[in-house]
Amino acid sequence: SKINQKILDKKIFPMTFGGEHSITPGCIAPFVKKHKKICLLHFDAHADLRESYNGEKFSHASAIRRCLDFKNVSVISFGIRNISKDEIPFLKKNKQRINIFWAKDKSDWDLKKFKKMIKNKNVYLTFDVDGLDSSIMPATGTPEPGGLLWDETLNIIKIAAKNSNIVGADVNELSPIKGFNSYNFLVAKLVYKILSYTFEFKRK
């Protein structure tokens, strides 16, 4: 959080790379202080709403839960297809702050509704690469079938860039497979696209 604060103080856009998704709560801390409200745009296979995982409150499985410890943070998640029973009560209790576009409902996603949800908001984008379908992104610690494909992912990011103010981003959970460079290039291009769309439509 101290590094992102220094970057913000210089009025530079912070793009942070994990490592684990557990970096995100620290990454957003300076934005929580700067803005009255922050909308976390979250791409992932997992909800990451556990209170703790193996006794660790700041686990990758608790990343979004820790972000929601900040009372001015709301979450819109895309691609979720794995959630534990322990996360369900918290999700139900906080349904006013958490909106999930479930992977199983992809054909019914209402992206016009999403556009309205983020309109003119300050958005922080966090992308766990296991949100992508395992057929195009097996190079991650917990790959899952049934996820996001390339073009639909870019479409969501582009809608966000056009209709909100993306203030920062992180991309995480790449676990390279020796000899298979295409997955590394995919993540590099994802970062390039996030930055390109953000600055193409950047609001002052």
Where is each model-derived feature located?
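Conserved alpha-helical scaffold segments that buttress catalytic/binding sites
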Residues: 1-204
